């Protein structure tokens, strides 16, 4: 569909293009019904996923792309889907998505891996704006997002995401679906936002606690919490949390309980 455009992927932008519409159709299908939703795509690249989204007739699709070389491709798509497609030439990290789309909103994207985690953390700050996310991550990052306690992948991303959403891994993909082929495997996950957070907690306080404890994840929780409070032993005792546990052993609720005591 874009054979006339010879675009060499830029390594500094983490560009890995998906050429197969069979793959992008499958990813978009994982997002479920999109006909009544505003859809946001990050890093549309050559437009393969863009076409897959537009074929499912969303209320509107807005794509954010940093690489100006891709403008001719997307100008063509804009003309083909008049009124349905908007293209924004910008860095997604600089945009508050609340300013460009009207709810209900779903995000569907093959994220640039170099900024994928930063984007997710940014969106969590206003996650109630979204209905859901269907996102391609590096498999290692996806495994961290969906991890449960007592798992080596469990950490900050797991807790902050799952406080606000149900998370599901939909499919793993090998490097062969991309051009150029990355050195890592990839995964598509669905993040479905809950009507309310699982637990009542001050998010900024929770984030600080989680960040400090998981930065020293091999240390016992009683040791790392002393960087935040002088009442570590009393707090853990009042919550019936053994003080010899490591952060990966604590549930999201236990972290929220600790935050509410500090």
Curated annotation (Swiss-Prot):
CDD domains from the UniProt entry: AdoMet_MTases
InterPro entries linked to this entry: KsgA/Erm, rRNA_Ade_diMease-like_C, rRNA_Ade_Mease_Trfase_CS, rRNA_Ade_methylase_Trfase_N, rRNA_adenine_dimethylase, SAM-dependent_MTases_sf
EC supergroup of this enzyme: transferase
Reactions listed under catalytic activity: adenosine(1518)/adenosine(1519) in 16S rRNA + 4 S-adenosyl-L-methionine = N(6)-dimethyladenosine(1518)/N(6)-dimethyladenosine(1519) in 16S rRNA + 4 S-adenosyl-L-homocysteine + 4 H(+)
Binding residues for S-adenosyl-L-methionine: 18, 43, 65, 91, 110
The keyword Hydrolase is annotated on this UniProt entry: no
Primary localization: cytoplasm
Record key words, sorted: Cytoplasm, Methyltransferase, RNA-binding, rRNA processing, S-adenosyl-L-methionine, Transferase
SUPFAM superfamilies documented for this protein: S-adenosyl-L-methionine-dependent methyltransferases
Gene Ontology cellular component list: cytoplasm
Pfam hit, one: RrnaAD
PROSITE patterns for this protein: RRNA_A_DIMETH (PS01131), SAM_RNA_A_N6_MT (PS51689)
E.C. number: 2.1.1.182
Localization of this protein: Cytoplasm
Presence of the UniProt keyword Transmembrane helix in the record: no
GO molecular function: 16S rRNA (adenine(1518)-N(6)/adenine(1519)-N(6))-dimethyltransferase activity; RNA binding
Family listed: Belongs to the class I-like SAM-binding methyltransferase superfamily. rRNA adenine N(6)-methyltransferase family. RsmA subfamily.
Function: Specifically dimethylates two adjacent adenosines (A1518 and A1519) in the loop of a conserved hairpin near the 3'-end of 16S rRNA in the 30S particle. May play a critical role in biogenesis of 30S subunits.
Name assigned to this protein: Ribosomal RNA small subunit methyltransferase A
Organism: Ehrlichia ruminantium (strain Gardel)
Lineage: Bacteria, Pseudomonadati, Pseudomonadota, Alphaproteobacteria, Rickettsiales
Gene behind the chain: rsmA
């Amino acid at each position: 569909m874009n054979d006339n455009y010879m675009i060499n992927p830029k390594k500094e932008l983490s560009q890995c293009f998906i050429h197969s519409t069979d793959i992008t159709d499958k990813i978009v299908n994982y997002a479920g019904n999109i006909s009544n939703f505003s859809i946001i795509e990050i890093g549309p690249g050559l437009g393969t996923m863009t076409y897959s989204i537009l074929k499912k007739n969303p209320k509107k699709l807005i794509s954010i792309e940093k690489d100006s070389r891709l403008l001719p491709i997307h100008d063509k798509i804009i003309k083909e889907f008049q009124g349905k497609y908007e293209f924004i030439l910008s860095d997604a990290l600089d945009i508050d998505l609340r300013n460009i789309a009207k709810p209900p909103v779903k995000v569907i994207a093959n994220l640039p891996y170099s900024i994928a985690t930063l984007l997710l953390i940014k969106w969590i700050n206003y996650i109630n704006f979204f209905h859901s996310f269907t996102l391609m991550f590096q498999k290692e990052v996806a495994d961290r997002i969906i991890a449960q306690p007592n798992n080596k992948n469990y950490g900050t991303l797991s807790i902050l995401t799952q406080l606000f959403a149900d998370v599901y891994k939909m499919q793993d993909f090998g490097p062969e679906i991309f051009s150029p082929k990355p050195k890592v495997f990839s995964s598509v996950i669905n993040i479905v936002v809950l009507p309310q957070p699982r637990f009542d907690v001050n998010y900024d306080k929770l984030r600080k606690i989680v960040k400090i404890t998981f930065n020293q994840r091999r240390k016992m929780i009683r040791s790392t919490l002393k960087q935040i409070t002088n009442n570590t032993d009393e707090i853990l005792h009042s919550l019936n949390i053994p003080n010899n546990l490591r952060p990966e052993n604590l549930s999201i609720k236990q972290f929220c309980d600790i935050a509410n005591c500090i």
